[in-house]
Amino acid sequence: MKTHRTDFCFCSRPAVARPSGFTLIELLVVIAIIGILAGMLLPALSRAKATAKSIASLSNLRQLAIGLQLYVDDHADRYPGHSSLASETTALGKPRTRWADYIYPYMQNEAVYLSPNLTRDERPRMSKAFAHTVADGPVETAQTRYFGGYGYNYQYLGNNRQPGGVAPFHARSSSLRAPAQTLSIGDTKGARLGNPANDYGHDGSGVYVLDPPLGSVMLGSQGSRRSSAEPGDGNAYYEGGSDGSDAHRSTPAARNNGRVNLVLVDGHAESLKVEALDGRSSGGSGQPHNALWNGVFDPAQR
């Protein structure tokens, strides 16, 4: 009897090929992780960008201080006025010469006169044309250059807003007994043209100056705009008003992580809270004073 051999093949079944790539669930997990990481990184990047702008702004202010000191050295130890006299305004309406124009020959880098922290909304109302870039009248051209965002401590350094026969005020550098504690130039947001409903810097109001928290009385120009020879007889702030009128004051701007960038008369730059600059406590309480503005670092003097 024949036997038949049957050949058996114990072969493994072919493996089912796994599709390449990620599954939908894996993709969703990866996307979620990326979203979490982005959410963690973006605020840090935003803070880093703000810090870089603040550092650039402090550098600008140091260079402006150099230009200002060179001007003072070249003008018998006297500071420039915040603006040219009203009597010097031309019939053609050419922009008046401002403090930035006065010191420009000594610091001819236009970029340092414009704050890197101005927002897109702020820039149109916070910028002033350099007078030397506007030829014969008020028409601005492609050659017109601008400065903006920085204000001058005009009530204690140089104020030409003196009507009624009162002489313009120009401080002597040697009269400032506390140069390391006297504001020279800093971030400003301008004034509100006397109307609380207006934006700061409305219609270019006070966008190139800074007012102290209290109007000057016995020191400096003895007021923003004096109406007589009596000390303090006149306005407290750039747009008029009396002490404490925020709508009239050309106010410091806390553009740098909640701080005001500024440079002092001795040339060093700092970032201060508005409250500290105005002599208030960190919570904003207490009576303001002009110690960091008046040249003598004395809170009792104005």
Name the predicted role of every residue range.
Residues 1-24:
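N-terminal leader/signal peptides at the extreme start of proteins
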Residues 8, 16, 50-52, 56, ...:
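Sequence-pattern detector for short linear motifs
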Residues 13-15, 30, 36, 42, ...:
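N-terminal cationic amphipathic segment used for targeting or macromolecule association
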Residues 17, 35, 54, 102, ...:
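Short, flexible active-site loop motifs that bind/organize anionic cofactors or intermediates
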Residues 20-59:
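Amphipathic alpha-helical segments typified by the pilin-like N-terminal helix
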Residues 57-58, 62-302:
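Short, well-structured segments within or immediately adjacent to enzyme catalytic domains
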